[in-house]
Structures are given as structure tokens and as C-alpha cells.
């Protein structure tokens, strides 16, 4: 295998070629840093968290593909993944996971002790998540915890503590993650039923759209509460309204439960997250 071919395999394994997951992780993390700092976060902390998000998203993809390597070949969307197709060995994938994980932990060691402790929990959660799809119909709810863990870490890094304000943002992101990852799971639902992978898309059944809507409303309420507790103003409110607009559009996309529109709805959440981030940033700047 040439160096170019190896890079192609690694980029697909870590999803560097598909940044949507990194962006969905990044927006709430950046919001947490801004809220914790009351505006512009410490530059060192900001750089560490941005790099950390990229690395840990890659780690999550590797361990997810490792856990699903025997099932991915039966699912239309995942059968070409490097581990499922045999392009890379499990040993090589795990070595890469360890290298990236240690790199992320090395960055965390540059921060305070509370962040280090929280990061250990975060790594454990990241490793556990892929295996929850075997034992529970609600892996998206566990993913919501994993996907939101950077929020208390961001507050701890910036302030040395995790106040109630952080948990409002955590709850908002948890609800939002369950909503958009259920949309994602709707894409694979037929294949997942055949191979025994569990998901909230299967659990919610014919009420999937309605329950996604409830999670979107709960996320909205918690995002408002987080902004209220931080005394945010009109421009953050405009970001919230834009988030509502995108959420409404997503409901329209998933109405017929077809694969392509459901995937489009999932991808659209990047813009919803960006709207919240821009609204919050503008509220601090103007």
C-alpha cells in the first residue's frame, strides 16, 4: 500500500474526509468556552480544545468502527469502511486509537487538575459508547453524554469549576444530540433491524418524528436557560430563533422517513449549531 493509499484509509477511518461530526462537537464546546469566559476565552485553552475536539472525534470514529467491524459490512452506508472492508487490521486501528488518545490526554495535562479528571471520564465514555448499541435501544442517549462532555471540561478549564450554567448547556446539547442522531439512525433503520443493531429510531418507531420534535423543544428550552443564566441578550435570541427555523426545516425533511432526506436533516444540524455559536459570539462582541 502506497503512502497516499494509507492516508486515504486513515482519513476514512478517522472521518477526516467528513468533518460534520467534528463541527457538531465543536459548536457547543466553543459556546461553553465563551460562556465560561464571559466572552473571549483564554487563547491557550481555546487552541487546546479545538485540537482536542478534532483528535477525540477521530478516536471515537476508530473505536466505533472497531466495535462494529463485523456488522458494518451488512449495512449499506458503512460496508466500505476500512475495518469492515479489511483495508486495515484491527491491531493497526487500535494502535492509531491509542496514539491519538494519548495525544489528546497530553494536551489536557497542560490544563488544571479538574479538567484532567473529567478527561479520564470522557475517554472511558468514548470507549463504552459503541458497545451500547448491542445492549440498549437508547445508544443515542448515551452518545448525548459523550458528545456533551466537552462542556463541563470547557468550564473547568476556563474557571476551575463547573457551575449550574454549564449543566443547562450540557442538557441542551444532550437533547439536541439525541434528536439529530436519531435522524441519522433513521437512515440505517432497515439495515439495523436486520443485523440487530439497536437505536432510538427503532425504539421510537412510528412516533419517531414526534419524539424528535420533543427533544428539539427540550433542547431549545435548555439553550434559552443557558443564555438566561449568563445574561445573554437580543443577538443570542436571534441565534435561538434561527435554530428553531433549522429544526422546523429538519422536521419537514424527515416527514416521509426516506433515507436521503433524513441524512440531509442530520447534516443540516451543523448550520443549526453554527447559528447558535454565531448568535452567542455576536451577543458578546456587539
From Swiss-Prot:
Transmembrane segments annotated in the record for this chain: 21-40, 95-115, 142-162, 167-187, 210-230, 235-255, 266-286
Pathway(s) served: Cofactor biosynthesis; ubiquinone biosynthesis
InterPro entries to which the protein is assigned, alphabetical: HB_polyprenyltransferase-like, Prenyltransferase, UbiA_prenyltransferase, UbiA_prenylTrfase_CS, UbiA_sf
Chief location: membrane
Main enzyme class: transferase
Catalytic activity of the protein: all-trans-octaprenyl diphosphate + 4-hydroxybenzoate = 4-hydroxy-3-(all-trans-octaprenyl)benzoate + diphosphate
GO CC terms: plasma membrane
Subcellular location: Cell inner membrane
A GO MF label: 4-hydroxybenzoate polyprenyltransferase activity
Keywords associated with the record: Cell inner membrane, Cell membrane, Magnesium, Membrane, Transferase, Transmembrane, Transmembrane helix, Ubiquinone biosynthesis
Obligatory cofactor(s): Mg(2+)
Matching Pfam families: UbiA (PF01040)
Entry EC no(s): 2.5.1.39
PROSITE patterns membership: UBIA (PS00943)
Origin: domain of life: Bacteria
Listed GO biological process terms: ubiquinone biosynthetic process
Family, similarity comment: Belongs to the UbiA prenyltransferase family.
Chain's role: Catalyzes the prenylation of para-hydroxybenzoate (PHB) with an all-trans polyprenyl group. Mediates the second step in the final reaction sequence of ubiquinone-8 (UQ-8) biosynthesis, which is the condensation of the polyisoprenoid side chain with PHB, generating the first membrane-bound Q intermediate 3-octaprenyl-4-hydroxybenzoate.
Name of the protein this chain belongs to: 4-hydroxybenzoate octaprenyltransferase
Classification of source organism: Bacteria, Pseudomonadati, Pseudomonadota, Gammaproteobacteria, Alteromonadales
Amino acid at each position: 500500500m502506497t503512502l497516499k493509499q494509507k492516508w486515504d484509509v486513515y482519513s476514512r477511518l478517522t472521518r477526516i474526509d467528513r468533518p460534520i461530526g467534528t463541527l457538531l462537537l465543536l459548536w457547543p464546546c466553543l459556546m461553553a468556552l465563551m460562556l465560561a469566559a464571559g466572552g473571549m476565552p483564554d487563547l491557550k485553552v481555546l487552541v487546546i480544545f479545538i485540537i482536542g475536539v478534532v483528535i477525540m472525534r477521530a478516536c471515537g470514529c476508530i473505536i466505533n468502527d472497531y466495535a462494529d467491524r463485523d456488522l458494518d459490512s451488512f449495512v449499506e452506508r458503512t460496508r466500505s469502511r476500512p475495518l469492515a472492508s479489511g483495508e486495515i487490521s484491527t491491531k493497526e486501528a487500535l494502535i492509531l486509537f491509542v496514539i491519538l488518545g494519548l495525544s489528546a490526554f497530553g494536551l489536557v495535562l497542560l490544563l488544571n487538575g479538574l479538567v484532567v479528571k473529567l478527561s479520564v471520564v470522557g475517554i472511558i465514555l468514548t470507549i463504552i459508547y459503541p458497545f451500547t448499541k448491542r445492549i440498549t435501544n437508547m445508544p443515542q442517549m448515551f452518545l448525548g453524554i459523550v458528545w456533551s462532555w466537552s462542556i463541563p471540561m470547557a468550564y473547568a478549564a476556563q474557571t476551575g469549576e463547573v457551575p449550574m450554567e454549564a449543566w443547562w448547556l450540557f442538557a441542551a446539547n444532550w437533547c439536541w444530540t439525541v434528536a439529530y442522531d436519531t435522524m441519522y439512525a433513521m437512515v440505517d433503520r432497515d439495515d439495523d433491524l436486520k443485523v440487530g443493531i439497536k437505536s432510538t429510531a427503532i425504539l421510537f418507531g412510528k412516533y419517531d418524528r414526534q419524539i424528535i420534535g420533543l427533544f428539539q423543544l427540550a433542547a431549545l428550552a435548555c439553550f434559552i436557560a443557558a443564555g438566561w443564566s449568563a445574561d445573554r441578550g437580543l443577538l443570542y435570541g436571534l441565534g435561538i430563533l434561527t435554530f428553531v427555523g433549522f429544526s422546523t426545516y429538519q422536521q419537514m425533511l424527515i416527514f416521509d422517513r426516506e433515507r436521503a432526506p433524513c441524512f440531509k436533516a442530520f447534516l443540516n444540524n451543523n448550520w443549526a449549531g453554527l447559528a447558535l455559536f454565531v448568535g452567542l459570539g455576536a451577543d458578546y462582541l456587539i
